[in-house]
């Protein structure tokens, strides 16, 4: 994907996040942060809180997912992009997503420090379903 298009996609998802909010009666939820990524709008680091609704079938499928958070463009855009992809996907498949999945989703290679930003929503999802 063209670098300009990637920047536009990430900026759009950061400014107009999809699935932003909190589910009223989630089956699973978790909040996580990356204190190493600080900025003027997020002096304590990136934060993502995820709420998830799962199907009753076996294996369960993600029926709904919403997030709230603050942080760098990459962390918030990735949370938006990830939640779009999670809906309708079996939980066991989502927990297997890795850095390659994230890089494909955001359209670029990620350094280890940027990967920590991009994976916040995925880490929150894994912890949420593990804790339920």
Question: For each of these PLM feature ranges, what is it?
Answer:
Residues 12, 39, 49-50:
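Structured surface interface patches that mediate subunit assembly and partner/cofactor docking
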Residues 78-89:
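Alpha-helical support elements that line or immediately flank enzyme active sites
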Residues 33-43:
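Short Gly/Pro-enriched turn/cap motifs at secondary-structure boundaries
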Residues 1-33, 55-57, 61-64, 89-132:
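C-terminal binding/interaction regions
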Residues 45-47, 60-62, 77:
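Short connector loops at helix/strand junctions that flank enzyme active sites
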Residues 74-79, 117-120:
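Catalytic-loop motifs flanking and including active-site residues across diverse enzymes
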